[in-house]
Amino acid sequence: MNKPENFEEAIEIKRDPEDFSVEEIADIEPDPNGKYTIIKARVRDWDTNRIAAEIARRLHMSRKRVTFAGTKDKRAVKLQYFCINSADVDVASLSGIKDFEVIESFKSSHYLTLGDLIANHFKIRFYGIDPEMFRERYVHIISKGGFPNFFGDQRFGSRRRNTHEIGKLIIKGEYEEAVKKYIYDEKYDKESYRKHFIDTLDYKTALERFPHSLSFERSLIGYYARNGTFKGAFDSLPKNLTIMFVHAYQSYLFNRILDERLKIYGLNAVLPGDIAFPVDAYFNPDKSKPIEVNSYNREKISKLVSSDKIRISLPIFGYKTWIDNSDFGDVEYGILKEEGISQDDFKNKDFAYLSSSGDRRIISAKPINFSLENNVVEFTLGKGIYATVFLSSIGRLKENVYSDSEAEL
């Protein structure tokens, strides 16, 4: 990713999960007559999809009945909301889950889905850069209009940075190749049982050798064992998990577009044909009020961008996404062409739930509620804005990521 300045000092984070904490800020109204149970939990060192699966297992219910508002870094301590599609939940049965503590639970009429957050508050211990230099860089970034709103690397996998590659295969209808890449990717996987299954398709041996902790891989292999095909195998996984593959590829495309925008125009350019949105204090855009930049309003919008009232956006490609009617629109089309993808490819003819109409995302943001004491920094970011991306604008980020055999998203 392109950075606004050439800051190359390394910032190391996540030596321990406790070095990186995040608390979700949500607006969920309790309702004693609600049909859903909301749980706020302290979660340590769990992948979000895997802890959701464990919650479902402890409650003896389908994984599909457990939802959450946002995926979080695995190697971290999270205060996170989960929604159980039942008003009758034995919350005490969750007490035995390692590194998981229920902080509060209540009934609600609100069904929690991805994106149902206002913001996230972070507290991060960092190493390798002087705190005063960190503060100077922060002041510089704020004065220059913020940091580029890239999707963070964790969007593409905690350990195996290939979810966007799997997503592209799904979009192109290459389901067998997508399943195989999920089960075994030679760039990341060293376990012999993974490669053996891909080489032989011997599902009996695979189900004996794959550990039960790799529940998603086992589900895919089990589907193949029952059906003799990979085409519908992703139906055996939670839908929100499979959709994340598609979203990861869309995020990859957005990052490519934003990177090109920065190279050509920088972070703060306002072009005729750009689409802008009003933003709140957290830099959450109001997408119900798009504004197209033209020669008459360009100067006014530039001033509103400078005062953090408005932000320019770029497309997240889908089958309904409009390409910018600006000088930059040709670059957006060019990236699709380079990828060998059309917008129609995002309308999945085999599995409707894997279709995506697309979206737009603002190109820059700022942290708020910033504080720095010694080598611990705290700040708040709007939903979908990545703390690791902000840190990458301060210096070269070094994340400590597990190298164990668990395949994670």
UniProtKB/Swiss-Prot annotation:
User: Is Ion transport found in the keyword set?
Assistant: no
Q: In which domain of life is the source organism classified?
A: Archaea
Tagged with keyword DNA damage = no
Cysteine pairings via disulfide bonds:
none
Instruction: Give the Enzyme Commission number.
Output: 5.4.99.27
Q: Which UniProt keywords apply?
A: Isomerase, tRNA processing
* Residue ranges constituting the TRUD domain according to the UniProt record: 146-365
Active site (catalytic residues):
73 (nucleophile)
Pfam families, alphabetically? TruD (PF01142)
Q: Which reaction does it catalyse?
A: uridine(13) in tRNA = pseudouridine(13) in tRNA
**One of this protein's GO BP terms?**
tRNA pseudouridine synthesis
Gene Ontology terms for molecular function? RNA binding; tRNA pseudouridine(13) synthase activity
Chain segments annotated as coiled-coil in the UniProt record? none
The protein's role, per its UniProt record: Could be responsible for synthesis of pseudouridine from uracil-13 in transfer RNAs.
Q: Which family does it belong to?
A: Belongs to the pseudouridine synthase TruD family.
Q: What is this protein called?
A: Probable tRNA pseudouridine synthase D
